[in-house]
């Protein structure tokens, strides 16, 4: 064993340096940029710009059938990869490059195909989106699998949630904040200020947000590569740098069948991701703030900031709970709080009544008489619910590394790649399912 490995595992624990804990989670922020750029807007883009109707929404879900084949193959390939720059960094670099090129083609070049060649639009959209999905799998799988080499210290892994959230704010948060601002500049209104055409129907919007999103993602990817560089070496592959048994393709199904913790984690992670995908869906937010509350441009950003403010104390509480009682206990506790509060939000929305000031949101800056009891209750339920949920939304990610470590202890096999891609598969399935669910709900 090399000196670095020996130093890291002299007491049986592989610990990460502070800068490694802070930088590597930015890989998730890098992919979350595309989560917003693609999964939140591709359906609207396909419908309003490419004129594909519901095809884009349905294709996002249907294509997951192919993922059931490609994801395990990518995971198995990762488990067998060992290059001069490590096991994980090649997939991070390749994934980032593939996604960047795919998004440029999708948002900037496909609209140039004339409407007289609609068949080519359908084929090109399907092909480009499929290639983008492969790149997304390459990079997202590293977020899960790479933690096995970064640290196996139970007191350090929960910290991933905090640093991951910082990365998400630098990626997903910036995109969620920036895109509506850019979109507002492309809104077409009449002299009375009534919206005639949404900025989301203007192809120029996508040509502006594409290079911005790519630049943010590439920067976060580069920082994440720096974070894992020292640990992406053979002596850190597995528990304590032990030699690992080779795994045959035929063995993967049996391994996953016997790894009960991983099965339960995939179910929990699917629920968290589905809730996030629906709650942050563009169509849902437009309906909530624009139709139900009547002022999307004035309410969207303040409510988003409110949620982040409430999330701060929950991040600290969830990490503390994870370190004391384990990540499972922390996830269960704070998701339960979020569920109760969101039920309260639903009840308040059902109770609201247009024309009745006591049963509507009222803010002084919107011409209201002041903040009423209904508004206070809504802010508390929404803020606490969003804060508790957001603090645990990515908690299943470090738990994938725990499941991989469990498999190494159980069978002696080190397969972080297949663990990461299986979780990524579920992640993409439910994210895409959210698009289809939202589309069908609004059709009813």
Task: Pin down the residues of each PLM region.
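Membrane-embedded alpha-helical bundles of multi-pass transporters/translocases
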Residues: 2-444
